[in-house]
């Protein structure tokens, strides 16, 4: 790594310069993209920290392998075994700090139209100081007095914010599927194979949704019990069928010719994921069998211990959670997505069918693309106008912080933090 590149990265961490890829084999990166990537990286770090805090395994390993662990915990007043740094209440506090971080930047970046203002420089740079600020806010949340009142109030705020974020995800998925269907339909004028591609993808979407509902019916229900799970599966499955019929109804087709089964298929897959998340978060039911023994029902039985589905649920759920959140946060704030959500789409004749339709067919050259051979290579693409809405970007991450808090803690009351912890 050259000295010029090191100086550029130092300017990125401690100044207003944009982050770049230093390797010569790496392409230039746009400032608008690198900024969003850095905020997403901070977000992922906090999500991973929350998952660690919900892990009893990590707490036991730390106690076994860290010398003077109990003395250290008492020294920082975190309890005899640092119990204040793990569990539901710890996740609530860390997510409170992250939510405050993004909400402050939401207010700070209101009405920014280009990257020349001093507020835009703060948004696009000073990453080291922002990391310190994020860490300070997450740590400071542990010193909030009157824990019970704070956690009770914050739980309701988190529930409202989580539901709002789910709504944003649904709207974004509709826009995504509409763009997908519209782009591939445009290619049918020159190549009829695009019809086959649309049909294949639609079939895959409905197969995933149907297969998911069937598997959940097999593993999360039993013949004479689990009535709540059966009702949830029946209602959500019925709603997926309803939106599929509405999507191809004559009234919708007249108002929106590009509507079809692809959109409803994508939404059905997402509803299936939400149903899986709800069922996996629901506490297991324990009943007495005919021999008077406690039997756990309404959870997958893979033949090991009480919560034998936890590893599968946690890995799959966390992966889907991070993927959905990052896609929503990074794409819902672009101006093209905002226009599409308001019903303003590109003219059909301007559409060029592409497999990777999410990306523009070619980069937009700017005067900043200088053919330098080494050092930071950033394309400052927002001097004339921002690519995305800064304040809305931070607001979506604010809601995502609340959604993560509720999802990682299984939407439970913090008082029940000892009931069930992720492995």
Curated annotation (Swiss-Prot):
<dbReference type="GO" id="GO:0006658">
    <property type="term" value="P:phosphatidylserine metabolic process"/>
</dbReference>
<keyword id="KW-0444">Lipid biosynthesis</keyword>
<feature type="topological domain" description="Cytoplasmic">
    <location>
        <begin position="146"/>
        <end position="156"/>
    </location>
</feature>
<dbReference type="GO" id="GO:0008654">
    <property type="term" value="P:phospholipid biosynthetic process"/>
</dbReference>
<keyword id="KW-0399">Innate immunity</keyword>
<dbReference type="GO" id="GO:0005829">
    <property type="term" value="C:cytosol"/>
</dbReference>
<feature type="transmembrane region" description="Helical">
    <location>
        <begin position="259"/>
        <end position="279"/>
    </location>
</feature>
<feature type="glycosylation site" description="N-linked (GlcNAc...) asparagine">
    <location>
        <position position="113"/>
    </location>
</feature>
<dbReference type="GO" id="GO:0005794">
    <property type="term" value="C:Golgi apparatus"/>
</dbReference>
<feature type="transmembrane region" description="Helical">
    <location>
        <begin position="386"/>
        <end position="406"/>
    </location>
</feature>
<feature type="transmembrane region" description="Helical">
    <location>
        <begin position="312"/>
        <end position="332"/>
    </location>
</feature>
<keyword id="KW-0472">Membrane</keyword>
<feature type="transmembrane region" description="Helical">
    <location>
        <begin position="125"/>
        <end position="145"/>
    </location>
</feature>
<dbReference type="GO" id="GO:0043209">
    <property type="term" value="C:myelin sheath"/>
</dbReference>
<dbReference type="GO" id="GO:0015194">
    <property type="term" value="F:L-serine transmembrane transporter activity"/>
</dbReference>
<feature type="topological domain" description="Cytoplasmic">
    <location>
        <begin position="58"/>
        <end position="89"/>
    </location>
</feature>
<dbReference type="Pfam" id="PF03348">
    <property type="entry name" value="Serinc"/>
</dbReference>
<dbReference type="GO" id="GO:0005813">
    <property type="term" value="C:centrosome"/>
</dbReference>
<dbReference type="GO" id="GO:0006564">
    <property type="term" value="P:L-serine biosynthetic process"/>
</dbReference>
<feature type="transmembrane region" description="Helical">
    <location>
        <begin position="199"/>
        <end position="219"/>
    </location>
</feature>
<feature type="topological domain" description="Extracellular">
    <location>
        <begin position="1"/>
        <end position="36"/>
    </location>
</feature>
<feature type="topological domain" description="Extracellular">
    <location>
        <begin position="111"/>
        <end position="124"/>
    </location>
</feature>
<keyword id="KW-1133">Transmembrane helix</keyword>
<feature type="transmembrane region" description="Helical">
    <location>
        <begin position="37"/>
        <end position="57"/>
    </location>
</feature>
<dbReference type="GO" id="GO:0070062">
    <property type="term" value="C:extracellular exosome"/>
</dbReference>
<feature type="topological domain" description="Cytoplasmic">
    <location>
        <begin position="220"/>
        <end position="230"/>
    </location>
</feature>
<feature type="topological domain" description="Extracellular">
    <location>
        <begin position="333"/>
        <end position="385"/>
    </location>
</feature>
<dbReference type="GO" id="GO:0017121">
    <property type="term" value="P:plasma membrane phospholipid scrambling"/>
</dbReference>
<feature type="transmembrane region" description="Helical">
    <location>
        <begin position="157"/>
        <end position="177"/>
    </location>
</feature>
<keyword id="KW-1208">Phospholipid metabolism</keyword>
<dbReference type="GO" id="GO:0005886">
    <property type="term" value="C:plasma membrane"/>
</dbReference>
<feature type="glycosylation site" description="N-linked (GlcNAc...) asparagine">
    <location>
        <position position="183"/>
    </location>
</feature>
<dbReference type="GO" id="GO:0017128">
    <property type="term" value="F:phospholipid scramblase activity"/>
</dbReference>
<comment type="function">
    <text>Restriction factor required to restrict infectivity of lentiviruses, such as HIV-1: acts by inhibiting an early step of viral infection. Impairs the penetration of the viral particle into the cytoplasm. Non-ATP-dependent, non-specific lipid transporter for phosphatidylserine, phosphatidylcholine, and phosphatidylethanolamine. Functions as a scramblase that flips lipids in both directions across the membrane. Phospholipid scrambling results in HIV-1 surface exposure of phosphatidylserine and loss of membrane asymmetry, which leads to changes in HIV-1 Env conformation and loss of infectivity.</text>
</comment>
<keyword id="KW-0945">Host-virus interaction</keyword>
<keyword id="KW-0443">Lipid metabolism</keyword>
<feature type="topological domain" description="Cytoplasmic">
    <location>
        <begin position="280"/>
        <end position="311"/>
    </location>
</feature>
<keyword id="KW-0051">Antiviral defense</keyword>
<dbReference type="GO" id="GO:0140374">
    <property type="term" value="P:antiviral innate immune response"/>
</dbReference>
<dbReference type="InterPro" id="IPR005016">
    <property type="entry name" value="TDE1/TMS"/>
</dbReference>
<feature type="topological domain" description="Cytoplasmic">
    <location>
        <begin position="407"/>
        <end position="423"/>
    </location>
</feature>
<keyword id="KW-0325">Glycoprotein</keyword>
